[in-house]
């Protein structure tokens, strides 16, 4: 997908997103439903333990919650947000971790679902007190940074191949003057070979654009100046702790790897890409 086409898709997606702020007044997760299953209770039993989400969203939409996803470390969730006008909003989503809980003041970024007016799909949840952010998208590098990274990788590979070819040629000819690289035609071919590999790297990097579209749309909705360069992984709790030399000897918990500091990411974006 070309940069222009991807930008257009991101713009359209960002316009579809909407934001709701308020208190988490009800929450249902995969773990909750699995515990209910283990207790020989059905989805309807969630109502008995205080959750009205089953009645609002429906058993069918929550059916996957009670299923065991062995080897897949994600958590489905349904959430009820009560805004300042005491209006209730319902969302369903799937994140690597669900740390937010009832009583938290959050900001939910969501996408309306076609043919569904009872609830929407949550694409990101922001804890307004701690500036923690959770999303279903794990993007290590931004779209442009990922393309440049893969270009450099393929470029380095091509240069290494050329160097090995030169060494092989030298051992055969046993003379620098007689090496094929002294031929202008071979020099041009070598240069074109490196350029082709760099172009292939760009195209391979472009094939991962789809993974960045949703995250870029979220960051665009939040007012980031350069979403295509954003790397939330640099602002995960574990990365920030490592940078500040906190818990250096410990392997980071899963929640630390998938919980991001939005305030630090926004500050970096403003300092690097904001209007001077």
What are these regions (language model features)?
Residues 94-108:
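Short nucleic-acid-contacting surface segments enriched for D/E, G, S/T with interspersed K/R
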Residues 111-151:
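OB-fold/S1-family single-stranded nucleic acid-binding modules
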């Amino acid at each position: 997908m070309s940069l222009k086409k991807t930008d257009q898709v991101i713009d359209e997606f960002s316009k579809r997103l909407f934001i709701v702020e308020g208190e988490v007044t009800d929450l249902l997760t995969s773990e909750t439903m699995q515990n209910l299953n283990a207790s020989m209770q059905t989805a309807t039993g969630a109502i008995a333990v205080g959750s009205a989400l089953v009645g609002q969203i429906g058993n069918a939409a929550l059916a996957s919650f009670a299923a065991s996803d062995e080897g897949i470390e994600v958590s489905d969730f349904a959430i009820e947000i009560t805004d300042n006008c005491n209006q209730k909003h319902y969302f369903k989503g799937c994140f690597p971790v669900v740390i937010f809980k009832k009583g938290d003041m959050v900001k939910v970024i969501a996408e309306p679902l076609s043919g569904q007016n009872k609830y929407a799909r949550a694409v990101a949840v922001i804890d307004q007190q701690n500036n923690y952010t959770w999303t279903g998208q794990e993007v290590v590098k931004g779209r442009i940074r990922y393309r440049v990274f893969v270009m450099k990788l393929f470029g380095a590979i091509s240069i290494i191949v050329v160097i090995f070819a030169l060494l092989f040629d030298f051992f055969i000819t046993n003379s620098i003057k007689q090496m094929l690289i002294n031929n202008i035609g071979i020099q041009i071919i070598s240069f074109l070979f490196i350029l082709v590999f760099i172009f292939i790297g760009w195209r391979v990097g472009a094939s991962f654009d789809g993974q960045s579209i949703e995250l870029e749309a979220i960051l665009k909705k939040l007012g980031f100046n350069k979403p295509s360069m954003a790397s939330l992984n640099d602002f995960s709790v574990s990365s920030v702790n490592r940078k500040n030399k906190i818990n250096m000897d410990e392997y980071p918990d899963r929640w630390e790897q998938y919980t991001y500091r939005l305030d630090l990411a926004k500050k970096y974006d403003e300092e690097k890409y904001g209007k001077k």
